[in-house]
């Protein structure tokens, strides 16, 4: 993703880092990149991701076809000039890599943990479309919380104060920032966030309770060939994910232990606007005569927000039969049944709890709950016989209705 790595530049930076720290400098600099490779190990197709932070490397890979069920082997090691040395682990050490890396490929030898088997490694760098051919160097602050003589870990993480952009070994721009990871540093990412055909640059700022990760983003201005701050309306979005197909920005968020959702934004001129939002709710469910509430978070795909249930030929689909992870029903906030709208742009149907008089106990008002039962909605009046003290008096009902 970073284009051609200037090895001479990296060597010079390593010298500057050592010299600066030795002389008590308050900053150090190191190159970073994230790369995706495909190719073969022992003739078998693999998919590889590697991140470089100065001379340290980490990443993972899997044998094709990769999917969620396939285990990814964990990679860690170092880059010494053009020599790449990695250990791979699947819980325990499973192999070692010794290879040469160039701007376009990795070639070398894989050796088993017992050193009895040796196979060729042949990987090609999948250069992203529109790659800006810019090398990135991070400027890190050396202070009481970071000791550069020790490995970066949860107790030793530097604050990144700037990103330097180089092309062909020449500094073209410096972007000031304030980024600090929890147990490692964040690496910048190239993404076209405003869908103008030019890659923009982003870096996370910190790691709060996920997924609310704030990012700092710079947009590429082709008229000046410089990177400029994205507008505040974009910077305020946490964990933004550009959807290039629909030209939208998607943000999954968390408002607490029991509040999650997804927002959709779209560019309007030089600003972004919120165009849709979906939040979590508690779905009431009847299953085998028992009452439950199931926590549901809407999802995003195909350019729109999707809810769990939709109507088809008068029935709900998919039928709600799995109550694993659901809780026994109790009256809490945000209980409702939500039905997916038939067409994009339409509002979802939201069926709330209503309070209704209990004919079996005059003067008592109980919740009429829109339970989903299999493939249909089964409203049920939940009384004190079901759950003690769930109903309210007439006076309480009048006060609530005002």
Which residues does each PLM region occupy?
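Bacterial N-terminal signal peptides
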Residues: 10-18
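Acidic/hydrophobic-patterned starts of short beta strands in beta-sheet-rich repeat architectures
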Residues: 193-205, 245-250, 351
């Amino acid at each position: 993703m970073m284009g051609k790595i200037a090895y001479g530049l990296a060597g010079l930076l390593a010298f500057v880092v050592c010299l600066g720290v030795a002389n008590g400098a308050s900053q150090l600099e190191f190159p970073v990149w994230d790369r995706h490779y495909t190719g073969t190990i022992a003739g078998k197709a693999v998919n590889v991701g590697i991140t470089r932070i100065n001379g340290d490397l980490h990443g993972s890979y899997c044998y094709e076809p990769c999917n969620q069920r396939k285990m990814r082997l964990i990679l860690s090691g170092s880059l010494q000039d053009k020599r790449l040395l990695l250990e791979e682990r699947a819980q325990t050490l499973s192999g070692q890599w010794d290879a040469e890396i160039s701007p376009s490929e990795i070639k070398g030898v894989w050796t088993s943990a017992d050193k009895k088997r040796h196979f060729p490694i042949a990987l090609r760098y999948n250069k992203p479309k529109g790659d800006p051919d810019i090398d990135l160097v991070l400027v890190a602050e050396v202070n009481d919380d970071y000791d550069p003589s020790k490995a970066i870990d949860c107790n030793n993480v530097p604050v990144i104060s700037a990103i330097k952009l180089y092309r062909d070994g020449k500094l073209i721009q410096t972007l000031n920032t304030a980024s600090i990871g929890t147990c490692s540093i964040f690496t910048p990412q190239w993404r076209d966030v405003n869908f103008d055909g030019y890659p923009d640059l982003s870096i996370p700022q910190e790691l709060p309770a996920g997924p609310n990760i704030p990012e700092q983003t710079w947009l590429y201005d082709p008229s000046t060939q410089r990177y400029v701050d994205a507008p505040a309306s974009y910077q305020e979005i946490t964990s933004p994910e550009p959807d290039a197909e629909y030209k939208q920005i998607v943000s999954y968020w968390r408002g607490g232990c029991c509040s999650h959702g997804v927002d959709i934004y779209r560019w309007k001129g030089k600003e972004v606007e919120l165009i849709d939002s979906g939040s979590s709710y508690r779905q009431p469910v009847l299953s085998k005569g028992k009452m439950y509430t199931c926590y549901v978070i809407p999802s995003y795909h195909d350019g729109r927000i999707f809810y769990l249930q939709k109507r088809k030929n008068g029935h709900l689909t998919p039928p709600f039969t799995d109550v694993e992870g659901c809780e026994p029903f109790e009256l809490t906030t945000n209980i409702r049944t939500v039905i997916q709208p038939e067409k994009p742009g339409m509002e979802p149907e939201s069926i709330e709890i209503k309070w209704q008089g209990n004919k079996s106990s005059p003067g008592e008002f109980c919740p009429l709950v829109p339970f989903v039962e299999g493939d249909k909605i089964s409203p049920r009046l939940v009384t004190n016989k079901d759950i003690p003290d769930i109903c309210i008096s007439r006076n309480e009902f009048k006060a609530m209705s005002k």
